[in-house]
């Protein structure tokens, strides 16, 4: 797997560091080998702890990278030719999903390893993060979390009422079929 750095204060952001949680968990799911979890569990916990340094009071994450000397987040700092020339999802929304994902995988790893206290800690964080995501990003009027995968993130996390879930699925279908021509 090599070394997966947090890349703090560089253009890479959270998405590279989350490999510390996703790679061991997905390896375990595919091969059933607990050793990968045993070898990486401490690092998985530290990655989530690092991510929580970016939490806002409402439980969602923020993007704190900016231009040198300017505390204002620079939303286009890490984008290259692979990004569309139109709108992209809010980084805070994507980072909040990543925190949920890493917390969820770490809680699952703790369960497999019999680490009950860690399982409870990371499950509680995942649940709080999921709830904060739904509260902040769901647009009740549109029945949507937004375009470009935002609805998929919400559906993966779950934890929403059935009626809301149906509206989100409807919005996602419309986005795929109408906005992006299928």
Language-model segments: residues:
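Active-site core of glycosidic bond-cleaving carbohydrate-active enzymes
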Residues: 1-182
